[in-house]
Amino acid sequence: MSHLVDPTSGDLPVRDIDAIPLVLPASKGKNMKTQPPLSRMNREELEDSFFRLREDHMLVKELSWKQQDEIKRLRTTLLRLTAAGRDLRVAEEAAPLSETARRGQKAGWRQRLSMHQRPQMHRLQGHFHCVGPASPRRAQPRVQVGHRQLHTAGAPVPEKPKRGPRDRLSYTAPPSFKEHATNENRGEVASKPSELVSGSNSIISFSSVISMAKPIGLCMPNSAHIMASNTMQVEEPPKSPEKMWPKDENFEQRSSLECAQKAAELRASIKEKVELIRLKKLLHERNASLVMTKAQLTEVQEAYETLLQKNQGILSAAHEALLKQVNELRAELKEESKKAVSLKSQLEDVSILQMTLKEFQERVEDLEKERKLLNDNYDKLLESMLDSSDSSSQPHWSNELIAEQLQQQVSQLQDQLDAELEDKRKVLLELSREKAQNEDLKLEVTNILQKHKQEVELLQNAATISQPPDRQSEPATHPAVLQENTQIEPSEPKNQEEKKLSQVLNELQVSHAETTLELEKTRDMLILQRKINVCYQEELEAMMTKADNDNRDHKEKLERLTRLLDLKNNRIKQLEGILRSHDLPTSEQLKDVAYGTRPLSLCLETLPAHGDEDKVDISLLHQGENLFELHIHQAFLTSAALAQAGDTQPTTFCTYSFYDFETHCTPLSVGPQPLYDFTSQYVMETDSLFLHYLQEASARLDIHQAMASEHSTLAAGWICFDRVLETVEKVHGLATLIGAGGEEFGVLEYWMRLRFPIKPSLQACNKRKKAQVYLSTDVLGGRKAQEEEFRSESWEPQNELWIEITKCCGLRSRWLGTQPSPYAVYRFFTFSDHDTAIIPASNNPYFRDQARFPVLVTSDLDHYLRREALSIHVFDDEDLEPGSYLGRARVPLLPLAKNESIKGDFNLTDPAEKPNGSIQVQLDWKFPYIPPESFLKPEAQTKGKDTKDSSKISSEEEKASFPSQDQMASPEVPIEAGQYRSKRKPPHGGERKEKEHQVVSYSRRKHGKRIGVQGKNRMEYLSLNILNGNTPEQVNYTEWKFSETNSFIGDGFKNQHEEEEMTLSHSALKQKEPLHPVNDKESSEQGSEVSEAQTTDSDDVIVPPMSQKYPKADSEKMCIEIVSLAFYPEAEVMSDENIKQVYVEYKFYDLPLSETETPVSLRKPRAGEEIHFHFSKVIDLDPQEQQGRRRFLFDMLNGQDPDQGHLKFTVVSDPLDEEKKECEEVGYAYLQLWQILESGRDILEQELDIVSPEDLATPIGRLKVSLQAAAVLHAIYKEMTEDLFS
């Protein structure tokens, strides 16, 4: 019978989740062995199992081959045995014939001893020797007992049938042997029919027995042996009486021996046949097991192939992620190279600046040399003046005057010298400038002269060209000289020539005048050009000076900017220090906040267009959210399913559950192919848990048959979601429907899709988680910073240790391809464990976690600092395996004992002692650390002062009342910043034990709570933590009401709660009576609200409140509520039969115990049971009318009250018979008021340890109380401190 196996039965998650098993393995059949899920086996284990199965298969094959060989050998032996059996049957057929002949002739053998019968007897003996007698099962008896004759002597003898008797029974098989009787025997039998009648009948009976024994498997050896022994009697022919008897006896002995041998051979053959049957059966079983192993091997191979495909997909995804990381690193490398290039350019600029710096240094050296020379000259001048003053014979007072005058003169001369040096410097600068200008002017003048010479030469050349050749050698003379020369010449004929010459001269004069004009113009042009050049030079000098000034201004501006930049960096560092001191986010965290709180930019246009069924407004989705859609389309049921349903048109519907949502149900549909067409849409928050669910888990889908008002499950199937991560398109699939008995009842069509890609949504979700963590720490830091302002400066512990966990670098997750969500945990001295905030999905988390530990310097603390080390563990919030951590670092504390701070990076090692990043830690004292030996004398002095104040106790009690430094040191103190114990004086008298227990019980409660929680609840807790638990409204101490721990603060809720308070609470009466004793219960119960309940379902007893004119403000009242009480099972109170009923009371200034005790006594709670009182008391603290109560509270806060800053609750036993027994105090519980003042938060149902009156260190139970007093305590403390300082 073939068993159906669920194809998705192997798709188990790698890591089991504690909440809901996501995958249920399908049944493999009844005979199948339960195997471990293949998804939890790695590749090596699968290969080992595969090779093991292969070796087993080969061994089974070899065994089957050996069995086949053995079967062949057995077959040959069987053929041999069948042949031998045929021979034996022939001999057995011949034996009865001889026996009947022997019986018939027995009487005649003794009388007739003729010789003609001897050959016949010899023939019979030869026949027996040839064929051999049948081997009997047992030895033949020697005495002839005779046999029953089947036929009469006269009856005819029937012929022997060839195939056996026809009248055999129906359940016997026909004989399968052939007759091997010889012709000779047949002749003898035919010749003597009368003698062999009984023999033939015995042969027929023996053959029928043999034919019946063969199909049974030769399992009747005894009967065959008996029949063979009964039929193996052969009579010999008669002989002579002398020789017949001894031969008869020998023949019988030989025949008995031969029959015994044949019977042994038959037994052996039967045993061999039985062994052969057993081997055949074993072979059949082995073949069946081999078939089963082959089927298992095929299943293992298929599972291995599917697992290999999944692993290849995972490896491909990891490879793609690695490639993306490589690309990102390449981009970062390019950016870093660009930064390096810019830094190189800046370095070149720095080299230029270094050169200029060297020049300035040289100038400074020159100035220093001049300064040395001036100092030397001054010293020489001073020495000369002193020598001249010493040589003169003036009185001592005149020398002093002279020295003063000389000093004045020297100072004046020095001033003059300095002024002259400055003038000299100015003159030298002006001289250098003038020299430069002079050189420039000289160059310009030489250039102008050269140009002028060139122009003159050009003009002269032109003039020589214009004169006649005979006159070129004569110098140009004045016209008057020429005129005189012409007058000297007397001859008149030369007048014409003179006229011509005069004309030429006039022309020359005109040309000369033109030339002179041109030269003047040229000179004017040159002068103008010189002026222009001078202007240009002045402008150039102005531009140069302007450029120098600009350069100087630019350098000054750069220096100023660098100074401003340094100042800005210093301010940033100071602000970061302030932020770290107040636990506010730093710049890196603010960047994460900025990127984590900005809206997610999704390009909806790039997404594929969907059909008409998209009716969801995607814009309503928040950042980090995604929309998952699952559509159930249609089912196709088989005939087997319809037969199981008992209806050809069944009415069915489907149910399924997805992730942590509720179960969805499709509408009803009728028919063998029901069409559901139902879509479920889930708004998911993309995180690692959801991603893991989609990758590894599957959802179960059930098809139910509806019958009237009832329904029954018809079939079930599984839907896997891993393919939806690959695309944003619709992913269609078929789910196989399996019935309750494992039959296949059909398939179901469905599709699913994610609206947005999973990777950017996951990144946005991680950034948002980081932002919310940083914002929550910002709110905490702001609250702590404001709490610092309200803390009293009058009290401080002896010292305070600051421990800061700054950041971690290079953390690696235990799972490849994932980012850890780390947080750090450590324990200092005897304090409780302190853990940091959880930074989601970060390899380099910034914690900025600061913790302050107020300590008393004792020898134990000093020994701890000198011998021990601070062990810091870093855990991964996503790792669910217990005992695993990312890394551990050990910080030696010896420098703290030497009053030195500790700051640096410490290596983290994983459980295998391999490095896994580093952690930056800083430890520092608030005050200088002084070893405990220096406190011995001040301690004695304080003890002496306290003994003077306590005058009502004896000296022995007084010595016992003052604790030592070790006793004053709290073993555990709340480690949240801003929560310190109030400074108290040593307790007086008998309350020493109570005070010591108060410290122990207070330290036993763990106040710190990690911000991160598992999975989806972490985000809910963060939102509640920001909106409700840690808002700045808590620090302002205004509008604070009792509320549930998970309720939100709103106006409507406040109004509603104020109305409830108006109906359920009231102000206390103004009491002016003295404090009543403890056992006084006869006073009336006034102004209180009581509700008594043995269990949560019991009735409440309510005392109606007193009416009041107006509701009191929170700063004018306080409300104390006793909620419930429970005892530990091992406490002595539980075994004390005298304690039947208990009630709770407390003392408060002038209020009588009748108002502060629970009005109803409840029976003692059983083991593990909690009784509820719900007794609340509103105490009036009006500033004008109740100054005494306000002063009482201030004294408690300031440590001046005997109660030492806590409110004491007493659990009292109320006897049933009040006449015979009195009330007895059972235990005490203490509530710290400083805790409320420091934290600024009211206490809501806080559990207090109840201690025994005999042993204050032994808790016997817990008392749950609530106290609304934050606003009034803050107002009283502020008011009283202002009155003290004013």
UniProtKB/Swiss-Prot annotation:
State the organism named in the record. Homo sapiens (Human)
Q: What ranges does the record give for the region Interaction with RPGR, renumbered to this chain?
A: 1091-1281
| Region described as Disordered | 144-193, 934-1008, 1058-1108
Where is the protein localized? Cell projection, Cilium
Q: Where is the C2 domain?
A: 781-906
Q: What is this protein called?
A: X-linked retinitis pigmentosa GTPase regulator-interacting protein 1
- Lineage of the species this protein comes from: Eukaryota, Metazoa, Chordata, Craniata, Vertebrata
Tissue specificity annotation: Strong expression in retina, with weaker expression in testis. Expressed in other neurons such as amacrine cells. Colocalizes with RGPR in the outer segment of rod photoreceptors and cone outer segments.
Disorder association? Leber congenital amaurosis 6: A severe dystrophy of the retina, typically becoming evident in the first years of life. Visual function is usually poor and often accompanied by nystagmus, sluggish or near-absent pupillary responses, photophobia, high hyperopia and keratoconus.
